[in-house]
Each structure stands twice: as C-alpha cells, then as structure tokens.
C-alpha cells in the first residue's frame, strides 16, 4: 500500500534495505551490484529498487539529506512495508587527523545537536546506538574482505554549514570519528518501531585538512563500503 512518500506495492521491499542519502547513489548501487533489479518507488525522485545479491533479496532506497527526510522514509519503510534492517551507506566529514579521506567508519553510536530523539524520549537524552548484530555482521565482512575500517561515534548535525566551528574541537576531544546528518535520527526511528539500524559511511572530505572528493566520486565510487555492507546483508 502506497504511503505519502513511497508508491511501492506491498511486498516490494526486502527485509534488508541499504539506505544512502542520494537517490542516484541508490540507483548506482542497484545497477552495479544487484541482479534482477526492479525500480519500486519514485515519489519526488526518491528512488528505490529491489533485486538480488548472490541470490538473496536486497533493496536499496534513497533517504534524502538530514534527519527529518531520513526519518520519514525510515518510518514508512518499517511501519508500512515491514522492513527489518536499515543500513545507511553514505559519506561523512572527518575531524581527527587519525582518520583519512576514503576511510570507512561504522557508526556504533550517534551524537547529535538535533532535538528529535528528545521529542520521542520525553525530553530525556536517548542513547542513539546501532544494532549490535548488524554491527557484528559488517565488521566480519570488512575483516574477511580486508577493508580498512573504524568503529566508533559519529555526529549527526542538523546544520551542514555550522555557525560554531569550535564544536569540531570538542568532537575531536571526545573521539567523534565523523560528521554526517542522519544516523541519530535513523537509530531513534528503528528503536521506536522495532527494527534494526546501522550507519556505515566513507570519509568524503576532511574538515581539518581540506582534502575532499568530487561529487561524481561520492555518487559512484566508495565501492568497498558497498561491497562489505552487501556481504553482511546477505547473512542477516
């Protein structure tokens, strides 16, 4: 049954959905890695696809940018389409010089300046953490593929253009590995509605050094991250 933001039919989505922010990255993942691909939704050009990877049914759909957009799609996928596992695959900015551009970060927890989880947790601080079984599966896949990765906290920012750059110093002191815009909201939605979620991101730019990747590279590369996530997804 269609929702206000997804026009897929019942049963169109697999139990596990890879969840990039960019709908064109969703299209790239589907066309590059999946077989027997079918586009299942296109409302507002937020594209979603279902296919198979090594014989296992997998879906991929864009989430848009930021916690509000991500939360809408995550909620509808879980509540209306019965999705059980949502794995964000995207990009982030690095803060520490110990983290390099193109490193893969697995977000065990997500700090945030958003109030969204306080709204769902009666004004209290909610510990936005990933599902351990998803984390374990992705770490195992990374180890088997020999992919370099880091596990730790990310920061989900409400503002891309921050008015408070000194906050980066605090994040580095507290060992936050990367800054992105969705994970804290995704983890909250998953907990609220009984699903599992994980955030896996590749460092696309470095806040300290100024090194960055191009928009084309962000859209169509970072294949190591996608491959290790898919390898984990078929074990769930």
Curated annotation (Swiss-Prot):
It catalyses: a purine D-ribonucleoside + phosphate = a purine nucleobase + alpha-D-ribose 1-phosphate; a purine 2'-deoxy-D-ribonucleoside + phosphate = a purine nucleobase + 2-deoxy-alpha-D-ribose 1-phosphate. Signal peptide: none annotated. Catalyzes the reversible phosphorolytic breakdown of the N-glycosidic bond in the beta-(deoxy)ribonucleoside molecules, with the formation of the corresponding free purine bases and pentose-1-phosphate. Homohexamer; trimer of homodimers. One of its GO terms (biological process) is purine nucleoside catabolic process. Pfam families: PNP_UDP_1 (PF01048). Its EC number is 2.4.2.1. This is Purine nucleoside phosphorylase DeoD-type. Keywords: Glycosyltransferase, Transferase. Coiled coil: none annotated. Phosphate binds at residues 21, 25, 44, 88-91. It comes from Shewanella loihica (strain ATCC BAA-1088 / PV-4).
